[in-house]
Curated annotation (Swiss-Prot):
GO MF annotations in UniProt: 4-hydroxy-tetrahydrodipicolinate synthase activity
Primary gene name: dapA
Site entry (Part of a proton relay during catalysis), positions: 53, 116
Lineage: Bacteria, Pseudomonadati, Pseudomonadota, Gammaproteobacteria, Chromatiales
Role according to the record: Catalyzes the condensation of (S)-aspartate-beta-semialdehyde [(S)-ASA] and pyruvate to 4-hydroxy-tetrahydrodipicolinate (HTPA).
Annotated protein name in UniProt: 4-hydroxy-tetrahydrodipicolinate synthase
One Pfam family, short name: DHDPS
Annotated binding of pyruvate, by residue: 54, 212
InterPro entries: Aldolase_TIM (IPR013785), DapA (IPR005263), DapA-like (IPR002220), Schiff_base-form_aldolases_AS (IPR020625), Schiff_base-form_aldolases_CS (IPR020624)
Species annotation: Halorhodospira halophila (strain DSM 244 / SL1)
Pathway: Amino-acid biosynthesis; L-lysine biosynthesis via DAP pathway; (S)-tetrahydrodipicolinate from L-aspartate: step 3/4
Localization (cell): Cytoplasm
Length: 300
């Protein structure tokens, strides 16, 4: 692991490149993955999240999770922090994935709220407490109720903030007000990161420490600069960058993530857009919208 403990700025939720085959069991393209890591090191991303939602964690098996995280850590070679996506809707599985990420050399783990089985708030406390107690690695919790069907409330986050290994929250509930309440309750016990590019600046205005970014897959330098300016209090510069990138942020979700961003990465010639079913290639209408947003951002 690197010596970086505190996470700040633009942390790219990196795509997982795949070799287009039958769309059912397309192989991970490890060569392209390592090239992407190099790109993010060169372009100034502040950290890499491997095998998160954008990295198609839902369609990778356990061994593939481990292999993608290992390859990312190897390519990073201590030059940039690596955060491994290790969440699961089984506490035991999440512990095993998190332990594997720690052993691979990750600097932290990103743990999504358990999905589909819809635990109670007490269930969430016990779930994340068990992981924190079992694996001594910094852990960032991830609340994204639009995908999981379960919203981790601010009072629950407040209870978890005292756990020694819980260092942050990726908040993707969708409103700045939610992040502001978590920050008010938790203070400096826990850092809050935006889970959506479109409200990253708003969250940093109220005390957020950065963003786990989809757009940074294609505009890593710009997202780094936006966060650096905001965290330094230079809101004029941050607002100018944000205004220029807003159409791109919106286009990245014109169809379910990571469909648009994988197509955008392919358009830039960095990796193919192959992905596993049930995710399908970006539609022609989506391609037109993303292409226009990329042109507006000066990428094409």
């Amino acid at each position: 692991m690197t010596e970086v403990v505190m996470f700040r700025g633009s942390m790219v939720a990196m795509v997982t490149p795949m070799k287009a085959q039958d769309g059912i069991r397309d192989a991970v393209d490890e060569k392209a993955l390592k090239q992407l890591v190099e790109y993010h090191v060169e372009q100034g991303s502040d950290a890499i999240v491997a095998v998160g939602t954008t990295g198609e964690s839902a369609t990778l098996d356990y061994e593939e999770h481990r292999d993608v995280i290992r390859a990312t850590v190897e390519a990073a070679a201590g030059r940039i922090p690596v955060i491994g996506g290790t969440g699961a809707n089984s506490t035991w599985e999440a512990i095993e994935l998190t332990r594997s990420a720690m052993e691979a050399g990750c600097d932290a783990a990103l743990l999504v709220v358990p999905y589909y089985n819809k635990p109670t708030q007490e269930g969430l406390v016990q779930h994340f407490s068990a992981i924190a107690e079992a694996v001594p690695i910094p852990q960032i919790l991830y609340n994204v109720p639009g995908r999981t069907g379960c919203d981790m409330l601010p009072e629950t986050v407040e209870r978890l903030a005292d756990l020694p290994n819980v260092v942050g929250l990726k908040e993707a509930q969708g409103t700045v007000e939610r992040a502001e309440e978590v920050i008010r309750r938790c203070g400096d016990r826990l850092d809050v990161f935006a889970g959506d590019d479109f409200n990253a600046l708003g969250m940093m205005r109220v005390g957020g420490k950065g963003v786990i970014s989809v757009s940074a897959n294609v505009v890593p330098r710009q997202m780094h600069d936006l966060c650096a300016a905001a965290l330094a209090g230079d809101m004029q510069t941050a607002e100018a960058i944000n205004e220029r990138l807003t159409p791109l942020h919106q286009a990245m979700f014109c169809e379910p993530n990571p469909v648009p961003v994988k197509w955008a990465v392919e358009e830039l010639g960095m990796a193919g857009s192959g992905m596993r079913l049930p995710m399908t290639r970006l539609t022609e209408a989506g391609q037109a919208r993303v292409r226009q947003a990329m042109q507006d951002a000066g990428l094409l």
